[in-house]
Amino acid sequence: MKVRVRIPAVKEVSESMKTLSTTSELAAFCAEAQKHPYVTIDTEFLRERTYYSKLCLLQLAMPGKDDDTAVLVDPLSEGLSLAPLYDLFRDTSVVKVFHAARQDLEIFFVDAGVFPDPLFDTQVAAMVCGFGEQVGYETLVRKIAKKTLDKSSRFTDWSRRPLTDEQKIYALADVTHLRVIYEHLAGILETSGRTRWVQEELQILTNPATYITEPDEAWMRVKTRNTSPKFLAIVRELAKFREQYAQSRNIPKTRVYKDDAIVELSSTKPRDLNDLNRSRLLMREARKGDIAQGILTAVQLGLDCPQALLPQPDLGREKLQVNPALSDLLRVLLKSKTSDSGVASKLIASSADLDAIAAGLRDVPAMKGWRREVFGEDALRLCEGQIGLAAEGTNIRIIKL
């Protein structure tokens, strides 16, 4: 989390604040945590100079009112193993609580191939409980824990040692307030019967495919207006080489070359170093050595791609015949449903999903699971002319036709 607590200069650091630096200390904490219904977790990491995130600090807290049950874990300590933590992740009697868990979970999955079970993400839960879309930790701390966090605090290089007492207090705040937030949201979900909704949403966070980028599929993330299969074949090979190169050397893929360079190279089709040096968008480091050779090889592979193996763009939704009037009605219905349920509208259906439904598609997220209950069923009835919408003051009323 990037938001930190403002600490008055006169405040003394709690003597109970612990930093664990050995495997045995972590094991002892995790053994104690297994006696409790939940544990809150957060991480501090760096990713500016690497492909994979570098874990720099781990924060853990058991239920409690103060910092006595919260600890910091220093993963940079020599010889420290996170195996006890991963054993705790596998203990299904203890809920593992995060806020905006995706990047945290990616770190653990890459390191050990394990996911916390069961998982609770307060950001997802907050969207279901009426706190808006992608609500930030600072907002939940203010609204639920009734505390104030400092949004203007600067980012910290968490890889540097030793950590200051102020940094430690900052980090602990990410898990101590999270306890209050979790208990509050879990109570709302239980009362409203929406716990299952959150569980459905969290399935994508515990799906390995969420965190694995296959080099062969990297081209699908490159935005280009040219949909020619021959052009896309070169895009595919260039994106594949970049992903493989970045992964093998653990460097950001943008330091190899950027997406706009892929688009340019796929258009200019360089055959040799002289051609490569004419590129306007290619970084200097990419014009020589292994990267340059990889680019030339990738371009040639794309040019030589057999007709049967050429990539085909997914133009399914682009060719849809969208009924604009029906699409507008679906937006009105969605706004009405989100107003009634308190669920963030984007969590139920995106604009693209609404257009797809208006064009006759039914295999969209809004037509599955809890979304179908909240919105999908009435959306279908609206499309089929079974219901209409009527204004009633500031509200929208559904009427049967």
Please provide the spans of the model-predicted regions.
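Short, glycine/acidic-enriched capping/hinge loops at junctions between secondary-structure elements
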Residues: T50-K54, L72-D74
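An N-terminal domain-cap segment
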Residues: K35-H36, I41-Y52, G79-A83, D91
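Conserved short loop/turn motifs at secondary-structure junctions
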Residues: L46, V124-V128, D260-E264
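Accessory DNA-binding and partner-docking regions appended to nucleic-acid-acting proteins
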Residues: D165, L185-L401
